[in-house]
Amino acid sequence: MSAHDHFSLCLCDLIRLLWSLMLPCFYLSFLLTTILFLFIMGVRSWLQMKRKTRRVQDGRPAVAFFHPYCNAGGGGERVLWCALRALQNRYQDVSFVVYTGDQGVTAEEILDGARRRFNIRLPRPVKFVFLKHRLLVEAKLYPHFTLLGQSVGSIFLGWEALTEFVPDLYIDSMGFAFTLPVFRYLGGCQVGSYVHYPTISTDMLSVVRERNPRFNNADYISSNPVLSAIKVIYYCVFALLYGLAGSCSDVIMVNSTWTLGHILALWRTPNRTSVVYPPCDVQAFLDVPIGEDNEEKEQKKCHSLVSVGQFRPEKDHQLQIRAFKKLLDRKEAEPAGREAVKLVLIGGCRNQEDEDRVLMLRGLCQELGIADRVEFKLNIPFQELKKDLTDATIGLHTMWNEHFGIGIVECMAAGTIILAHKSGGPKLDIVVPYDGGPTGFLADDEDNYADAMERILSMSPATRLEMRRRARLSVSRFSDQEFEGSFLSAMEPLMSTLRA
C-alpha cells in the first residue's frame, strides 16, 4: 500500500469518527439546551408567581429603581430623588421601591440625607430593599478587567435584587446595563434606564488605540503595543456585549448630547432614546441675589475657587490642585500675594477608596506647599454648599468627557464664573454662548486652567457681573421643573402599561 493510499484510509477513518460523534453531540447539545430553557422558564414562572402574590397583597403595581449607591450624595442620586418625587406626585396608585447596597443606615436616614443634601422631600414613603452583595460592583474587587468584572458582578447583584422583590417596572438609574436583561427576560418586567455615562465609549477605545496614559489606561499598558492591542480587542468585545444588554431597555433616557451620541452608537435604539437633562437645584441658587463688588472691595477680597464633585479618580482633582499651584506662583509678585485666593474642594465619598483618595490629595497639597490655601469639605449639607458657591468667584471643573456636570450648572446658577473642562457635556450643552455672549471658560491642561483663572481674576467686577448674569439666565433649562416634565413624558409609555 502506497503512502498516499494509507493517508487516504486514515483520513476516511477520521471522517467516520467525527461523523459518528456528531449525532451524540447534537443530542447532547439539544438536551442541554432544553434543560437550560426549562430551567429559565421555571425561574421566570417562579418570579412571576412572586409578583402575582405581592400584587394580591398590595393591590398596586410597583416601580423599582436600581441604585446601589443611593446614599452617596452625588448628581446621580439627585436624579433618583427627583425622579421618585415626580412619579409619586403623578401616580398616586403606584408603589415605589429602591434597591440599595448601603449598609448600616436606615430608610429614614437615607431620606433625611436626600433632604439635607439636595433639599428634596418625597411626598410619600418608599420601600428600600437592602442588598448584601454590593461589593460585587466595587472596582477594587477587580484590579484587572474592571469593566467586565463589575458588569458580571452587577448581574449577580441584579439577581439578588430581583429575588428579593419582583417589580412590574424596573428602572436602572445608575448605569448597570447588564441588569436589564435579568429583569426583562427572567423577571418578565418592563425595563427602562437613565444613562449618566456609557460604561464604555469610543473615546475610551481611542485612548487605548493611541496609547495615551489615563486613569483607566495604566502606563504599563499604554507603553506596550501588545498589551494595548489586547486591550483594544477586550474593549471591542465588551462594547458589543454592552450594546446588546442596553438594547433590552424599553425606554432609554440620557443626560446630555455627548451621552446620546455614544449610546446611539452602542445600543442602536434611536426610537427609544431621548435626552432628559438632569435636575439641578438652580432655583435655590437663583433666589440669592448677586451684586457687583466695587474696586475697593475687590482689592481686599479673598477670591475662592470652588470645586463640587465626588472624590472619584475621573474627576481629576489633581489637575485642579496643580493648576492652582501655578496660579499661586504667579500671584506671589502681586501685593496681596497668595492670601488673595483659596481653593475649596467640596464633594462626597462613596467608600473607603474615595476617602483614601482624599488623603492622597491632602498629601499632594502638602508636597506642593499649598496646604494652607486649600480646604476640603466632605459630605456637607445643602445650605453650606449653597453658601460656599454664592461666596465663590470661580467654579472649577476638570473631568475629561464629563457626561453632564450638575456641579457646573449649580456653580453658574450661584453666580460663579465657571471654568470647566473643554470636553463632553460641559462643552456641548452647558458652557455654551447665550444671548450673544459667553457664559464661562473652558480649558484642558494645567497651563490653560492657570491662564483662565488669572484672566477671570483680572476681569473688572462689572465685566464679571455681566457674564455671571448671562450664565444664570442660561441654566433655567436645567431646572427641577424642566427635568420632571421631560422625565414624566419619557416614562409615560411605560407607566401607562401599569394601569392597563
Swiss-Prot record:
Intramembrane segments: 232-252, 404-424
Name of one Pfam family that matches: Glycos_transf_1
Main location: endoplasmic reticulum
Entry's Gene Ontology BP terms: dolichol-linked oligosaccharide biosynthetic process; protein N-linked glycosylation
Catalytic activity of the protein: an alpha-D-Man-(1->3)-[alpha-D-Man-(1->6)]-beta-D-Man-(1->4)-beta-D-GlcNAc-(1->4)-alpha-D-GlcNAc-diphospho-di-trans,poly-cis-dolichol + 2 GDP-alpha-D-mannose = an alpha-D-Man-(1->2)-alpha-D-Man-(1->2)-alpha-D-Man-(1->3)-[alpha-D-Man-(1->6)]-beta-D-Man-(1->4)-beta-D-GlcNAc-(1->4)-alpha-D-GlcNAc-diphospho-di-trans,poly-cis-dolichol + 2 GDP + 2 H(+)
Cellular component terms per the entry's GO annotation: endoplasmic reticulum membrane
Topology, Lumenal side: 1-20
Keyword Repressor in record: no
Molecular function per GO: GDP-Man:Man3GlcNAc2-PP-Dol alpha-1,2-mannosyltransferase activity
Record key words, sorted: Endoplasmic reticulum, Glycosyltransferase, Membrane, Transferase, Transmembrane, Transmembrane helix
Pathway: Protein modification; protein glycosylation
UniProt EC number: 2.4.1.131
Subcellular location: Endoplasmic reticulum membrane
InterPro entries: ALG11 (IPR038013), ALG11_N (IPR031814), Glyco_trans_1 (IPR001296)
UniProt topological domain (Cytoplasmic) ranges: 42-231, 253-403, 425-500
Membrane topology, as annotated: Single-pass membrane protein
S-S bridge residues: none
Domain of life: Eukaryota
The keyword Transmembrane helix belongs to this UniProt entry's keyword annotation: yes
Transmembrane segments annotated in the record for this chain: 21-41
PANTHER family: GDP-MAN:MAN(3)GLCNAC(2)-PP-DOL ALPHA-1,2-MANNOSYLTRANSFERASE
Described function: GDP-Man:Man(3)GlcNAc(2)-PP-Dol alpha-1,2-mannosyltransferase that operates in the biosynthetic pathway of dolichol-linked oligosaccharides, the glycan precursors employed in protein asparagine (N)-glycosylation. The assembly of dolichol-linked oligosaccharides begins on the cytosolic side of the endoplasmic reticulum membrane and finishes in its lumen. The sequential addition of sugars to dolichol pyrophosphate produces dolichol-linked oligosaccharides containing fourteen sugars, including two GlcNAcs, nine mannoses and three glucoses.
Record family assignment: Belongs to the glycosyltransferase group 1 family. Glycosyltransferase 4 subfamily.
Name listed for the protein in its UniProt record: GDP-Man:Man(3)GlcNAc(2)-PP-Dol alpha-1,2-mannosyltransferase
